[in-house]
Curated annotation (Swiss-Prot):
Protein name per the record: Deoxyribose-phosphate aldolase 2
Compartments (UniProt record): Cytoplasm
HAMAP family the record matches: DeoC_type2 (MF_00592)
Catalytic residues as annotated in Swiss-Prot or TrEMBL: 108 (proton donor/acceptor), 173 (schiff-base intermediate with acetaldehyde), 207 (proton donor/acceptor)
GO cellular component: cytoplasm
First-level EC class: lyase
Chief location of this protein within or outside the cell: cytoplasm
Documented EC number(s): 4.1.2.4
SUPFAM superfamilies for this protein: Aldolase (SSF51569)
BP GO annotations: 2-deoxyribose 1-phosphate catabolic process; carbohydrate catabolic process; deoxyribonucleotide catabolic process
Length: 265
């Protein structure tokens, strides 16, 4: 492959990746102003991101900012049972209902991965199923974060993926971005293969999150999805990137100046 061809291919992947981003800020020092700035970045010179991902309390501010800048179609995702992944179903449900009441389009709930590691394969199903029922009633998408970097072992990653899917997850997501090891190609391979093997590729998507920082990183994940699921599967209904610093790299690759955050998640 020539350098020119390689560059053209990377540009193609960069364009795809940008349209699949859940542009994220989930920091303790987040403010209304930072969330509004994130909304502005989501309307990039190379096109809009699929969504933004923020804490629930900022949803009304973000909704107003997206509407005022003429991009009401950018979806708003938020997080619940985050980042700890506790096994209290009632609290996870209450947080999910609150997120829906704030106006979330999508909820990313953390699976009780520690319970699974301790041998409890029932509570995760109950938690996801309960949150899914609340989301489905409000036409809200549910993504389930299984925290692959903590599960570590392939059989646990597969088991958590399977439980989440069978309990009704619309997406399975690698990571919170709050642990040392986040999205890896190895965990992505296991999770996408699980989607394929369960025959749910039409209805269940995949989201790598944390650690996807460059256009080259994004291209590798998209190549994997294309190989396992066929070209065309990885659209915004079936594939998202959870990231913040990735946007700056994508814009640079596409020849745009960027004021996007180039550090972090």
């Amino acid at each position: 492959m020539t350098d020119l061809t390689a560059c053209a291919h990377l540009n193609d992947y960069a364009k795809r990746a940008l349209s699949l981003m859940d542009l994220t800020t989930l920091n303790d020092d987040d403010t209304d102003e930072k969330v509004i700035a994130l909304c502005h970045q989501a309307k990039s010179p190379a096109g809009n991101t699929a969504a933004i991902c923020i804490y629930p309390r900022f949803i009304p501010v973000a909704r107003k900012a997206l509407r005022e800048q003429g991009t009401p179609e950018i979806r708003i995702a938020t997080v619940t049972n985050f980042p700890h992944g506790n096994d209290d179903v009632a609290i996870a449900l209450a947080e999910t209902r609150a997120a829906i009441a704030y106006g979330a389009d999508e909820v990313d709930v953390v699976f009780p991965y520690r319970a699974l590691m301790a041998g409890n394969d029932k509570i995760g199903f109950e938690l996801v199923k309960t949150c899914k029922e609340a989301c489905a009633a409000a036409n809200v998408l549910l993504k389930v974060i299984i925290e692959t970097g903590e599960l570590k072992q392939a059989h646990l990653i597969r088991q958590a993926s399977e439980i989440a899917i069978k309990a009704g997850a619309d997406f399975i997501k690698t990571s919170t971005g709050k642990v040392p090891v986040n999205a890896t190609l190895e965990s992505a391979d296991i999770m996408i293969r699980t989607i394929r093997e369960l025959g749910v590729g039409e209805t269940v998507g995949f989201k790598p999150a944390g650690g996807v920082r460059t256009a080259e990183d994004a291209a590798q994940f998209l190549q994997l999805a294309d190989q396992l699921m066929g070209e065309g599967w990885a659209d915004a209904r079936h594939f998202r990137f959870g990231a913040s610093s990735l946007l700056a790299s994508l814009l640079t690759t596409l020849g745009h100046q960027s004021n996007a955050n180039s550090s972090g998640y």
